[in-house]
Design a protein with these regions (language model features):
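Conserved nucleotide-sensing/catalytic segment adjacent to the nucleotide-binding pocket
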Residues: 82, 87-139
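Phosphate-binding P-loop
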Residues: 44-51, 129-130
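Long C-terminal appendages of very large multidomain proteins
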Residues: 354-592
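N-terminal pre-Walker A segment at the start of P-loop NTPase domains
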Residues: 10-47, 113-114
């Protein structure tokens, strides 16, 4: 059919706020399903009967049901005989093994109480030994429910010990017949890898090798709207041989920033939904063609504006809105952009050269540019809105498509300058390597914590975690307990052998005492605030309320340890040190 791509309708249904249907947001969608580590490491073991119990935990949308349904489909392909199929699981036999799946082990089903469902499901695991029966059970269940059900019942002696040790002890090795996978630890982005879940999903959407010919209907010979279509521009930009990889990696960095904020665990459902909206927005071929025919300015539907949409109710889009690259003040660049038509040769140099035949977004950008206020006395609100739309869109486009070499040469910035995180690269450097050369990062974190307690001597603040004493509040003298910096370390979280089954990239740094009695999780927002405090920044009351709760709890745990040092000062300049000597005597000295 001319001027119509049926694949777009399917992709639109993946978005959580789809106007067509949200039917493809749940369960197994074979068109966009990608093989993950879970499939590669576990599928054959399950179908060959090497695992007796597989437990999947995680959030809704993590792909638990899809994986179980894939196992069932694989079993059917191998000749399995199904005795039961319900909306909550199946029973079947394969090669002499009795299989049972349960999609949701945390809810009642068809009038049967949840505990009764679980009792029947876990029946073979009663007793004090590993079951000998040829069984394979696979269940998706809330971790809390698993704990409550198994650990509170005496009949699960053997399984109870395995569950308890798995939940309570780091790196506990389960019996070989068991596999427990927590999909909350799975990361959809990995800055170190080019085949992360994000990358694999993009490949499915883009069909760059034309194996499925998803975008054949969008060619100019098949669609008369091709040169004016934002969907074609969005897809072609990411498929472009010259700038596609750069744009893909910069979107990856934006999604990584959301991941590192830790406001929301990003599930498979979330990332599929987000990619769908960024590429396609919400409108069908017919609807977008009507908008083009009506002369609407459709700039807000281009991928770089979709990414930071300020209207949608999708949770991922809402978090992306918080890190909108258009909000970062870049005065020199903004002053330049404001007075330059987006079609000038100078503006073309700002962007990476691509091989696209059409750039319809420039028409909309130029329309906003020409409708800006004509001077400081022009108070026309519509013109002000045009100016805002023009500048915001140009900055977003520049983040994704900007030529870093040119930006660095002309404006002393690069695409990272658009992010609200000045220390984004440094944070990710440690996440990638886990290396802190010369303990420089540890020293900077220690200094920031000390400065947050209002101790301003940089040498003392770096060599000691300083925490103020509350006992001298009415005195002009300030006192600080000192804990030697060398007794602390920065490390990455360890998820043990879970990495056999899940894609993993750490989402935080851990700053802790070497004896592990006090530990602080540092996400990217807290890291940013701490680094700025180290430079002399004074956080706002809102920032303190938002980011400092965990920091305050950490300080209390540190204070529970015995300090051998107390620093005293009256003027923040001269510090006196009371320190317990090796002989047990208190020694007073003045610090430099």
């Amino acid at each position: 059919m001319q001027n119509y791509n049926p694949n777009i309708d399917s992709f639109l249904k993946i978005y959580s706020q789809s106007l067509l249907s949200t039917g493809l947001t749940r369960g197994l969608d074979e068109n966009t399903y990608i093989q993950t580590k879970l499939d590669k490491a576990l599928k054959d073991d399950i179908l060959n009967g090497l695992k007796k119990l597989i437990v999947l935990t995680g959030n809704a949308g993590d792909g638990k049901t899809a994986f179980i349904q894939l196992i069932e489909a694989g079993a059917e392909d191998r000749g399995a005989v199904f005795s039961s199929r319900t909306e909550n699981g199946c029973k079947f036999t394969l090669n002499g093994f009795e299989f049972e799946s349960l999609y949701d082990g945390s809810q009642d089903f068809e009038g049967k109480a949840n505990d009764q469902l679980l009792k029947e499901f876990f029946k073979p695991f009663e007793g004090s030994k590993e079951p000998t029966a040829k069984i394979v059970k696979i269940i998706a269940i809330n971790e809390g429910k698993l704990r409550d059900f198994i650990l509170k019942k005496k009949e699960y002696n053997w399984l109870g010990k395995e569950v308890h040790h798995y939940l309570e002890y780091d790196n506990f090795e389960l019996n070989n017949s068991l596999a427990f996978i927590n999909l909350n630890n799975r990361s959809v982005v990995d800055i170190k890898e080019q085949d992360s879940i994000y990358d694999e999903l993009l490949d499915v959407f883009l069909d760059k090798e034309n194996k499925k010919q998803l975008w054949e209907p969008c060619k100019t010979e098949n669609c008369s709207y091709a040169n004016n279509c934002y969907i074609k521009y969005n897809v072609d930009t990411f498929r472009d041989d010259k700038k596609g990889e750069v744009v893909k990696n910069r979107l990856k960095e934006i999604i990584l920033a959301v991941y590192l904020k830790k406001e929301k665990h990003i599930t498979m459902r979330d990332i599929r939904s987000l990619i769908s909206f960024i590429f396609f927005n919400k409108y069908t071929c017919n609807q977008l063609q009507n908008s083009i025919d009506n002369g609407e300015n459709l700039l807000d539907r281009y991928y770089y504006n979709n990414t930071f949409n300020d209207i949608e109710q999708d949770r991922m889009v809402d978090i992306l809105r918080q890190i909108d690259v258009a909000d970062m003040p870049l005065p020199k660049l903004e002053n330049h952009l404001y007075f330059q038509n987006p079609r000038t040769e100078l503006e073309e140099n700002i962007f990476i050269k691509g091989s696209l035949d059409a750039n319809p977004d420039l028409n909309y950008l130029e329309e906003y540019y020409k409708n800006k206020p004509e001077g400081t006395s022009d108070n026309d609100e519509i013109k002000k809105e045009s100016a805002d739309a023009f500048l915001s869109s140009m900055k977003r486009k520049m983040f994704f498509e900007g030529n870093d070499d040119f930006l660095r040469e002309q404006f002393d910035i690069n695409h990272y300058s658009f992010l609200p995180y000045k220390y984004f690269e440094r944070y990710n450097q440690f996440l990638r390597t886990g290396k802190d050369n010369n303990n420089q990062l540890r020293s900077d974190i220690v200094l920031a914590i000390s400065k947050s307690e209002k101790i301003y001597n940089e040498i003392i603040g770096k060599e000691n975690v300083c925490i103020s004493s509350s006992s001298l509040k009415k005195s002009t003298t300030k006192a600080f307990y000192g804990f030697t910096a060398a007794d602390f370390e920065i490390v990455l979280p360890d998820v043990g052998d879970q990495t056999k089954y899940i894609e993993y990239f750490p989402d935080h740094i851990i700053f802790r005492h070497v004896d592990k009695s006090a530990s602080l999780e540092i996400n990217i927002d807290l890291f940013e605030i701490l680094m700025r405090i180290g430079e002399g920044y004074v956080p706002t009351s809102i920032e303190i309320r938002t980011f400092f709760l965990n920091l305050e709890m950490f300080k209390r745990r540190v204070l529970a340890k015995r300090s051998t040092k107390v620093f005293l000062t009256e003027d923040d300049s001269n510090l006196y040190l009371f320190e317990k000597s090796k002989s047990g005597k208190l020694v007073l000295s003045i610090t430099q």
